[in-house]
Amino acid sequence: MRAEAVVAGQDAARRAANAEASARPSASYATETAVTVLCRTREQAQAACTLPWLDEVALDFLEVFGLKEAVEDVRAAGKRVVVATPRIIKPAEEHLWSFYVKLEPDALLVRGTGLLQHFVELGGPGARLENGVVVPRLHGDFSLNAANAVSVGQLLAGGALDRLCLTHDLSAAQLAGVAECVGPEGAGVLEAVAHMHLPVFHTEHCVFCRFLSDGENRSDCGQPCEQHSLRLRDEHGAQHLVLADQGCRNTIFAASAQSAARDARDLQAAGFGRLRVELVDESPEDTLKLLSGYRGVLRGEADPEELWVEMSTMRDGSGLAQGVTRGSLGGAGDRERASLKPTAYQM
């Protein structure tokens, strides 16, 4: 049964790989692991668009203000534009999906199985809706929790996704293992996040409303999140950025960046189609340094250690250099199989 699931994962990943390949412009580096970027400000996106080799820009604006203009910027630069959807859509927010579809991006970054199922029920990518808008291609994000060949196969089997980012829970070695398990063609549709500030906490409690206003909720808080930047200082002095989305949910991002600079070539050798650089509040200048640095490492033109040193001195939006780490990519070490308790499957 397990072998059949792995084979199914390979087949589904292969079909998605063919769809992804057909969508790539001829100028993309089909034989290389491509670098992609996820931007959270319009300035970052504009900077990324100046790189002639970059074929795609993903936009993750927690607040929708300025998103339409950023989509137009990316499209005008001749790049593919991917728009990230919210991780959580509550009962009163079902209409949000239509807003993102009406932007007519080249793809949507889907972050929840509920939204994925909704698009499947609408007919999937290419389906024409009542308002004449077409459902774009769908990319699965890390929050779909694809952690092994079986889950990769399950998510890709329906044909709705033509790209899938693996979960953050895996070490670099485990990421490579999944890519190798689904085979060369299947790995081509897989993406791994090579650089990010880990979203360590996601809550409905709004820190902006609580500490920067006298209001109780969005109706009377005055939206301080649109005028102020906020960070939480932990017991070690690290300052973690807080961002609010359109549903007033707050995401807290780790102060230190997590980087796969030292693992990028191994992930490329494993067959990953794309490595993603996720930005939070990096400056346009650092946006260019990061993207060019990772591409240089993948092409053998830059030393990973030199990139690591450069990243460790980069300052965030508050002017602090808060360092870089391998984080979960380093792994905690796998336990011996004999030391593990039997699972229900084994019983």
What are these regions (language model features)?
Residues M1-G158, R163-M347:
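Active-site pocket-lining/capping segments in soluble small-molecule metabolic enzymes
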